[in-house]
């Protein structure tokens, strides 16, 4: 009996420190993403492809807003990863921030996509694309919409 209670306590403890139940973790993994961080206030998952890498972060807080994420990218995230923030534009759905940097393979381009509106209260998204190609704004707009459609499909 003690072992059963201990087991239940451990299971409940694990669930209390993971993403909210409205996030479909199974679907994320089925779609080929690797879950990198899963705790009470952050879920981060990524997917590496030959031409583009994608990192998605969900923040679970009632204190956030899209402007905070935009500022954090410019002032903290981009510099921390050796990227130089260059420009930003907006679509009807998102803010798209541009950056570039160098790695051992040459120049890389980073595109940070922050939706203007959250699908669910208290859940803020950030989609970061990394590629070796500079992408035109019109293509970034399409990629941004596609990425947001996919990521928002994981939120019930």
Residue ranges of model-derived segments:
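Sec-dependent N-terminal signal peptides
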Residues: 4-14
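N-terminal "mature-domain start" segment
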Residues: 17-47, 79-88, 146-151
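Localized chelating/binding microdomains
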Residues: 18, 60, 71-73, 149, ...
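Short, surface-exposed coil-to-beta transition loops
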Residues: 38-40, 52-55, 103-112, 122-124
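A short acidic-to-branched-hydrophobic micro-motif
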Residues: 46-75, 123-130
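Signature of long, low-cysteine stretches enriched in small and polar/charged residues
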Residues: 79-119
